[in-house]
Amino acid sequence: MEEQTLIPADQLKAHFWDVFIVDALLENFDRHNGNWGILVDEERQTAEIAPVYDCGSCLYPQLGTQEMEAVLNDESEINRRIHEYPTSAIMDGGAKISYPRFIASLQNEDCNQALERISARIDMARIETLIQQTPGLLPIQRDFYRIMIRARKEQVLDCGMEQLLRAREQRPDGPVEQGMTLF
């Protein structure tokens, strides 16, 4: 992040954490250093971060409709797909980190701030409308995406926000950062 010169490092770091939170919501298991984009306009000599780049590993792309139906019919399978996998491609100590555990741990203040920024902007009604209006989706796919995104929002992001708000109440004068720094 510090090595590139096109985008101010603090802006890039904030964007990284915003995307991390969105990836947690959309179950992206493959966000790594090779799939970020910077839009460069050589004529104007400008550069900006691509708002969306390489999200092909979101929303269980290899899950067939029969598997989706099986997941929706088994609460323990829904919970496994929320709490056990997918994991982030980001590694800590040689292991991929768990989105729910990392977010709820509050161990990175940049992540905490992104959680606040992004959670405030998530409009589930608009997301569900988008899913309903997406052409080509089968009813089971619509149900699966709607249920899984809502469950991840409630059990990952909303739970993380509850933890963060409690921590901020206990320590109103400063960050609640508890440890790990990825940058």
For each feature predicted by the language model, list its residue ranges.
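C-terminal catalytic region of ATP-dependent kinase domains
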Residues: 41-183
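Conserved kinase catalytic-core segment
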Residues: 1-64
